[in-house]
Regions:
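Jelly-roll (double-stranded beta-helix
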Residues: 1-229
């Protein structure tokens, strides 16, 4: 198990946007943290009321958004216009190219969300978009599959051999990790104990094939687990 602490991440403050970068991104460059397997980006973003990312383009990337607090408004040139709220998972396959914008839907409250980039298995595909809601009850005290290559169990589909799980753990709740190959565990908020180590908000742990782990002692914790080929 290799732990990457929250305070080891890159950070950028643009006034309207405060962003932590788990892996190298924009002006933050660390050759030792360019990604993990197909997982390329985990950015924890806080966006001021009424602000956001204007129209910009992407190609050949699987982009997943996960809202923690507030409301995020998404628009793209495929004709999609949606508002995301906590518990929602959005997947956009950029493929041959997509133009989109993401804004804080509120003029009063902040927006806190994760943007995740995953390298695609196939390049040059037709761009597509998908958004689904995952109620608290489906994630409380257990792992809920929210993204997968085949879209099974009601998850959003991703153009890569990856399984993404979300879980909520409180009052000492615990859970064994689902079967995984390479695994990246990211604590979104709260605290958990993993193999005797306490991980807090923004902390992460990487596991190699054959390494086993379980979560214990969850306290108001929200956790994402990536199972990667």
């Amino acid at each position: 198990m290799h732990i990457r602490r929250s305070n080891q991440r890159g950070y950028a403050d643009h006034g309207w946007l405060r962003s932590f970068h788990t892996f190298s991104f924009a002006n933050y460059m660390d050759p030792n943290h360019m990604g993990f397997r197909a997982l390329r980006v985990i950015n924890e973003d806080r966006v001021a009321p009424g602000h956001g990312f204007g129209a910009h383009s992407h190609q050949d990337m699987e982009i997943i958004s996960y809202v923690l607090e507030g409301e995020m408004e998404h628009r793209d040139n495929m004709g999609n216009g949606e508002v995301m709220r906590p518990g929602d998972v959005q997947r956009m396959s950029a493929g041959t190219g997509v133009l989109h914008s993401e804004f804080n839907h509120s003029n009063e409250n902040g927006l806190h969300f994760l943007q995740i980039w995953i390298e695609p298995a196939k390049r040059g595909i037709t761009p597509s978009y998908e958004q689904k809601a995952f109620p608290t009850a489906e994630r409380q005290g257990q792992w809920r599959l929210v993204a997968s290559q085949d879209g099974r169990e009601g998850s959003v589909s991703v153009n890569q051999d990856v399984n993404l799980y979300a879980g909520l753990f409180d009052a000492g709740e615990q859970a064994a990790a689902p079967p995984s190959r390479y695994a990246w565990l990211h604590v979104v908020k709260g605290t958990i104990d993993v193999n005797g180590e306490t991980l807090g908000s923004g902390d992460a742990a990487a596991f190699q094939p054959g390494e086993t782990f379980s979560i214990t002692g969850g306290q108001a914790a929200e956790v994402l687990l990536f199972d990667l080929a």
